[in-house]
Amino acid sequence: MPSVAEILLNNIGHINESAMVHSSFFYAKNGGSQFLADTLARGLKVRYRQEAVNILPKDGKWLVQGELFDRVVFTGNVRQLGDCFPCMDELRPFFPRISELRFHGTTSVLCRISPNDYSWIYMPSPSHRSHRIICTGNFSRNNNNGDITTATIEFSEQMTEGEIRRQLELIPFSPVYLAHHWEEYTYPVQDVSSRTLIRELKECLEPKGIYLLGRFAEWEYYNMDAAMGAALDLDKRLAAEQMTRG
């Protein structure tokens, strides 16, 4: 990430930034980000729309929906650990600190917008409550319906459809409402103690075969590339541990 000084100088001088995470990226021609997920899932036994709750220890393994597993990689929300592992008394001392972890939600609004040449538009402004437009229609022509250009407009708060429609009238590129979704857990908010808490949780869980992975499991502000990198690193660790065990 650029420094504060670099941000100010680049904005004053209208200098393009080429090193930031969104300066260049690959995007699927069809299917969007779901295409990547489906591709990675090929050849794997994935059970969709299943709740992995009430995971219990049995015979030195973990019982998940009637099947026994040596290890569990938990990619959910760390605030739900107690629900997923109800018999782990070792977790109870952590519950007060886990409950204090802060987070932020987002209302995402699917819209039609005027054609433009942008991918992301960051637009903090006192005149409206949105902070950015993600021009998904410009990532691939297949994201659009004919000549209609689509975008996702984000608001950092929960909003009603009526509030959204009024806000869209104030936003550039003439957005037209199509649908919206409120996600309570979008961004983990870290403080000086959150990483210490997650480290201590890992030290407690990993000897028992439970591993935390992902944005809300590790309470880290992972972008997708960083999340995938963390998954690959954990996979290497687990493979090495398996070889050590023989």
Each language-model region and where it sits:
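Short alpha-helical patches at coil-to-helix transitions and adjacent helical residues
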Residues: 33, 37, 224, 228-232
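Hydrophobic, Leu/Ile/Phe/Ala-enriched alpha-helical segments that form helix-helix packing faces
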Residues: 40, 44, 164-172, 242
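C-terminal segments that line or cap access tunnels to active or ligand-binding sites in enzymes
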Residues: 70-71, 80-211, 217-225, 229
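Active-site/ligand-binding neighborhood in enzyme catalytic cores
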Residues: 1-63, 67-68, 75
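Active-site catalytic microenvironments for nucleophilic, acid-base chemistry
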Residues: 43, 80, 84, 237, ...
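Internal hydrophobic alpha-helix adjacent to the cofactor/substrate pocket in enzyme cavities
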Residues: 228-246
